[in-house]
């Protein structure tokens, strides 16, 4: 009984989801560890930075008087000047003779260019003077003599040992400046002032005690703290959007989840995590050097509130994104960008404080303002304490308040955006929904509140809708009226549903049928509220599905199993069920009981502790269904619930749904008509979004069915013509459906049911016709569907392309031989014309073309290679620019008062102050003050002797009286780099002013261009060479690892079975990979040498690099091919190997260079070892040796290191490795590559003798089925027969396979798992044998052995006319057809290119291929998909392509492993018709495996059922039905006016005809019975009696059907259930308890 509607509390759901989120975090260890360690890592890094860059506290420093101006500093000075004029010569003459006669040597240069050129070869005592005019000049010292920076103000730390500002005094710059100034003054005034200028003294200004704060580490600390908290928001956003992307959030909402609970569960989890992390980080930060004076509680509050706001910030972003991979990147990027905005606010002193708080809604900015305030309080107060929350420029109390408000704002915005932003799934509210009264006052609705009038009137009943019986009137649970749904795709509108109207009733199971894309899932999504209808109306118990609030009430009754599996991957089956049971509101004390019941009902106890991501496809569907039925919901909406399940599991599900049908509404969609036929009470067929019909099985079959199906199992002596004549004699309208050596099938129309008894009686009498047994079954629902949907389309298709027989209409115009020439793929007559070498060349070119196309279209690999190239080029360009910018970094500095002194009207600046003027004379200095006024220099008079008291000032001037004129003392601030020469310039200009000269002397300091030292050049070049080696080794896996992908998708197996020669495969890839790698490597090497043209070039030694490169490229490519055979289970093989290659190259460089310090011999040993053992190293070693050998000044002592000696091994080893890799590649190809169909002309080692295998006789099994035993003896006889006219195409004899499964590691005990047990069967040419069995029965093992992927333990296999391990020429089977279960298709290759590749591999010419492609695409309806890449194809089209590829080349043997998996009924019919047609010519054979019995019945001539690795039965479908079938099923539909008394009489009559008949659940208009086999002695008598009853009683129609193959299958698989519980729990008789109108009884 359905459970009543539950009201689930928000808090309970929150606690449940909190547990779920906690478990998810615990099991996604990678992200969880990052969330914990990332902040701590950054915190410890910041502590390290703060320890390395502490605030520098300087004690008070008194004035320091420098030694007098010393002319001896300029001893041996070479002074070059330009231009050479009378004036300049006169000036320099006075300097060299009058002022500095003993120390100067002057040189003349015609131009500055000559002067600069000469400086390159001059020693460091060379100084240049460049006159601009007589009053202006440049002094050019070498950079190591004077400061070169353009920064005018240095830090206090810069003067701790040697002061840049004092360099101008110690280097002789000011002495030379004074000398030239004196010469200019003398030239202008004829007055010599050299003695006064020479007497000038210099004093370093004293400084007060100060704390100096370094801005750079402070900025790093600020931005790092912002980034430290980013993992919380990053991973939270990814988790939430990932759940949205998988539809998990909407899935939870369908089960009644409150939005509040969803948000709260994540918020509480991350609040707890951030609380703990913030507390830990605050304690560490305050206990270390980061914030040592602050209160840990205050720091904790700041960290915690920021972490919380960053979490809400991430929540706010989640509604804006549909892909989890995007939201994480954007969240991190936005965090960093806003962090830098905050950094700008904090560090830019001129930023207006009034605007600072405008950025506080950005939590990153608010946090940075708070951290900056903490640092300020640490620097100038006692730290951030509660008592100082309101102090400082940006009070902390405001920051904390703003962070709290930010969290609230982000939370509200997240909820709002989640409600209004349209997503892919779910209903959305209007943008102003919170202003509507209805949102705040929700009234609950009753079930039946909506009347007929509310839903556009009653739905009209017509001929396509079967009226329901009276007992269902008024039980309409789901009402659908005029539903329409349209989607917008690019520029067109796609209508998914078109005016759909019908009712779904309580107490019934309703099936939605239709091909893929017909609108079934869309209707399901509308009913559960995942998407709103475009038009029309639907209600669930009166709740409108398009209204969010009403849908919330309806969802409390709904259990849903969507088409895609809905579960939490990292949780176990039991945890998934328990958590979702709690979400649904099942009482806590009943959850364990309910979960255990679901586990038992669906036979999932054995997997209850398995994580969902580790389940098979069928097990995941069981879990999804188990979630849907939890708590007995009143409404079940199931979208393809049994997809991917084996028959045993399907029957378990059917039993469960039938058992829970009463008082409940069950709606399911399916592609399997038998499932709908058996399970559903009413079926709604939808086509192109429109309703085709609604009704019961008997209504649909009688109205649209083709009738009964008569199947006769015949012997080899059967007179088929006489038999057909007998059938048509009784039933003229009978039609032949199928005929082969063992079975004949006719269709018998409904209208002739009264003649059935006569026909069956005649068959019983004429036993001499060769009919061993016969049976009858009613038309299937599949037939009805196809008649309604696609029969005409299927019949019109041309399947003759798959057979050697021409189409009927072509027979007149073309002979069979002509068709063979134009349509057959590599026919026998043409095969001899294609030599092995010609085919080899064709295959090489084909593989090369395919490989090139794959690389071209696989954007990920191309992007990776381009990115690596760009990284290398970017590093080169960056270092080149740095090199040249450093080279030209010297800028002229004009030494004028404006640098450091304020003008009138200027605002104070950090390095501009007024000039302190101290009068140490006994008189006034008005003329000096007038000079400063005339020069626009603001002065401040100073009378104290302690300059510290007047700090900070850029400089001061102390005036001392001398005999003739003033003598000055220049007092300069050591942090003002250019203040001393500026003061000297002021003094010189004062003397000019005093002598009535209005011009002023101008001076520039322009150091010579600084050349990069040789050691820097060497290190730079070495670094780039090492980088080249590391980056280039990372590239080959991205384009040479395709083999790993081909093995994963089994494309390589498919190619080998198609006749691909292994050597052609590898050479075809190498033809592309080697030139590509060579070009890339040449570009990188070319750029390396182009950017370093100054390298000393040794052509002979460079040839060694070239020779190394020639062999290195193929060596690395071949090694990569070998590596592709390993680590096949790694998800991203290319990325893994790229990382391994790069790390290995880096490690080699590191080891060789580190051991350099241990001695040259050790380095050489490692170099030689790496060259020999590591194939990616030789070029790197060769290149580094060449570069080191090209350096100048290599010592030439006896024991010196000579890099040229290391070149030889690096050059030779790649050549030797190439040979080794070729042999290893052959070895791995033989070991892991699978069986080759053709002999390889190059890889001859692959054609070795096969291993000797044992062929023991199977143990005697007395219970072995007689047909299985007969098949074994038949195979044995055929194997020993040397003169048989025609052997079967496939023979399998005593095939046995065991696997060793190591269970106990400690005791090393091994358990043996038997996959197949001495299986024997054969498949004749022209026959299709169906291999059936549950999961684990051994079907896939047999297929894998046949294709060569698995070696059998014992047994023999013969394919075509040769054994699988024969060494004879195999031209008879040039290729084998193979359609594997997983699609072996390349995602970036088009459908047409697949045909061309496989056609060329099989030896087809391009002309033949065009014709074949045209006909195949027409036959299988593939024309519109020809130019689409595989990744854009629907699943059904992919399966068609796999089948078509398996049939190319006219293979004698074809293996079809579940060929129609994932197809809708229309596509399956196309496939089945093509398969049947392909094998009519009697020259091919096929082995087909399947889970679906209807496929076996439709396609197979014989069926073999495997259970637990053994063959249990084999024979035709009819033979197995007759032999193993348990009974029949009878359905009777009564006329509406029949009375209860007559129904009782009819029931007694049925009991009389069939004494052991068991009545199933029935309704007033339909009676259903299961009839044991023993009650049906003769079909003719049974039909005769039923016809009498039809005329006697008010029976409108009836159906009487035999058991299907499905029943036989389930009966036999019960044995496997008993052995290993791989199937579900079934009842003892395996007779499914049928309820209303199911064709088959189980």
UniProtKB/Swiss-Prot annotation:
Highest rank taxon of the organism: Eukaryota
Residue spans crossing the bilayer: 32-52, 220-240, 264-284, 297-317, 327-347, 355-375, 396-416, 866-886, 967-987, 1021-1041, 1071-1091, 1102-1122, 1139-1159, 1164-1184, 1207-1227
Expressed in which tissues: Expressed in testis, epididymis, lung and brain.
GO molecular function: ABC-type transporter activity; ATP binding; ATP hydrolysis activity; ATPase-coupled transmembrane transporter activity; lipid transporter activity
Reaction(s) catalysed by this chain's protein: cholesterol(in) + ATP + H2O = cholesterol(out) + ADP + phosphate + H(+)
Post-translational modification: N-glycosylated.
Ranges for domain ABC transporter: 478-713, 1290-1533
Subcellular localization: Lysosome membrane; Late endosome membrane; Golgi apparatus membrane; Cell membrane
Primary localisation category: membrane
Protein name per its UniProtKB record: Cholesterol transporter ABCA5
Native species: Rattus norvegicus
Gene giving rise to this polypeptide: Abca5
